[in-house]
Structure formats: structure tokens, C-alpha cells
Amino acid sequence: MKRRVLGRTGEQLSIIGFGGILVMDESAKESERLVNKAIEKGINYFDVAPNYGNAQQMLGPALKPYRDDVFLACKSELRDYDGVMSDFTESLKLLKTDHIDLYQLHAVTTDEDVNRILSKDGALNAFQELRDKGVIRYIGFSAHTEEAALRLLDHFDFDTILFPFNWVTWHKNDFGKKLMKLAQERNLGILALKALAKRALAKGEEKAYPKAWYYPVDTFDEAQKALKFTLSLPITAAVTPGHEKFFNWACEIAEDDQLLTEQELEWLKKDAKALKPIFPED
């Protein structure tokens, strides 16, 4: 699988990332099968978080034989120093490793999140201390609002961002365009979430897939256009949704390595007009 450079870090990552939620609630045997499949396909970027149920517990043993050859990203959604330190210790234990390559503030959304993270006893001080100790290599964040992401970048020199760069949000709301521009100017590593999300669920609508809180693409053809769009942006990699069908589609599309055509781009722009984007949230 093709690899791209993760901004100024110089790390070479596969253009498809393995979303740890894939192994959430799976058996040890199934988790091992999924990780082995990813490795066979050339994936070296794995992303997980404590709030993905038991994903860390299932990913750790399955990934252990390959740990020295992969780039492991983890997160903490806690905003205080002590909480992050506790989260990190538990993540190391569950993931069967002695270090995390990329540790990220998870789902930063509100001004309050940012204020708590940046406070004297906030999460960011813990992240810096962990990096100084050598148990994490890079510091990043994922965000669900552009405002929160831009505020974080105003206050700290992060290595990476993880953000929903998606065809519907991009074309309907210009969501992420300011952030993308700033990240490029600073040569940050740019990672994408939700490339295969199609629309927000309607009120009372049941999930089509248990591990997806949004409605994903319907067909392989739609997935192909959507993922090719995200990969046409100056990103390093796109993390897959939590269901194997979409993981398989993403790998096939990446292996095919076809550029987005003008006709496909126009189709995506037109399709986006009729859809309710997943971000910004109401």
C-alpha cells in the first residue's frame, strides 16, 4: 500500500489507517485475523482510544508481534493532568507496549475543553511530560469543531491533527478548510476521520451499523468517490470506520490508487447538497 509522509515528523504512514474500533467486541481470534489482514495489506498505521469499548484490550495482543514495525496512535479524552496520566498508564498495559508513537487529545469540541486542556493542571502538561520522558514520540489531537482545533494550534506547536475531512462537510459547510490551510502552512501531519460518512442520522433513526453513529456510504462506488476525495486532499492517511466491509473497501480503493476525476468531484458536490452533514453538529 502507498505511504505518505506525516508532515514534519518524517514518518511514513500507509494511506489507510486501521481504526481500532474494528476489533471492539470481537473475539481474540477475530481481532488477530483483522490485524493480520491489515499487516498483509501493507497497513502500518493503527489508531485506537480508551473510549472504544474493549478495543485496546483486543488490539494489544493481536498487534504485539508487529509492534516494532507499526505506528501506533492512541488518545485520551480526559482534560486534566491526573486523568491523562492514569489513562496513559492503562493504555500501555492494555496495548502490550512500552510507548505510544502518537498520543492525541481526543474529540476536542468546546471552548471549555480547550480551557481545561490548557490550564495549569490540564491535559497538555501531562502530554508534554510524557514526551519528555520518551514514552510518547509525537503530540496531536482530534477535534470535532474547527474553532476548537484552531484555538489549540494558537497555543501549542502540535505535531499532528486528526479531523473529519469528508466530502459532504467540506462542500456543504467549508468545514475544515481553514484548519487544513493552517496545518499545511505549519507542515503538520494531517490525518483524516469520517471519509466514508454520508450523513447525520435523523432524529430517532436507528444505526445502520452498530459501531457507526452516522449513516455511512451505501455502495462501493460511493465509497470510492468519497475516499478518493479525502485522499486528494493534502493528508497523510484516512482512518477506516469500525466495520470490516468498509475496511475492505478502503483497502481495495487505496490499492487501486486512482485519482479523483473532475466528473467524480462534480458528482460529490451535487450529492452533498441534498445531505445533512455530520459536522458541525446541531
Where are the regions a protein language model picked out?
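N-terminal binding-site loop/beta-alpha segment at the start of enzyme catalytic domains
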Residues: M1-V70
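Conserved, mostly hydrophobic/aromatic
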Residues: L6, F18, F46, L59, ...
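Acidic (Asp/Glu)-rich catalytic clusters
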Residues: G7-G10, E40, L59-D68, T89-D98, ...
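Active-site mouth loops of central-metabolism enzymes
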Residues: I16-K29, A73-G83, N115-R116, P210-D218
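Short, acidic/polar
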Residues: D25-A38, Y81-K96, H144-L153, D221-L227
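A short, structured active-site edge motif that brings together acidic residues
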Residues: D69-D80, L102-H106
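Active-site groove signature of glycoside hydrolases
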Residues: L92-N115
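Beta/alpha (TIM)-barrel catalytic core signal, keyed to glycine-rich beta->alpha loops juxtaposed to Asp/Glu
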Residues: V108-D282
